[in-house]
């Protein structure tokens, strides 16, 4: 790879806004580009983040892309929890796996997925991204709980499990949203 390409790949902001593809509201492929709201979140990210209920601003999409990027380029362990198994499968298939499959072949070849199963990508260099309805055990650098308010209201036992399991897997200095 050329030095100028390596320099670009070292820039997380550039990678996020140039490497990854998503589908737009009409289902058409489009390159992921942060919206002003997503940029504000990205630039102000803290180790513990709360995103108030905001429909159609693309925060879950952005977090999926951030986690995929971290798993690929930082060998980070990442997890995304959805409130139902169907939503977890859909998020994995439509956000994570779609973006991964559309990456340039050179990027995938440099750190191939050794486990590419429904709900999980595990990369040769140690990073991983797990999408399910819960997480327990291990240590995470990134955790995103989608629809946590809904989980708390509809599934209080699952919410307690997330608080005592998944949140505890995210150590100080790592990121939970």
Where are these regions (language model features)?
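Phosphate/NTP-binding elements of NTP-utilizing enzymes
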Residues: 1-177
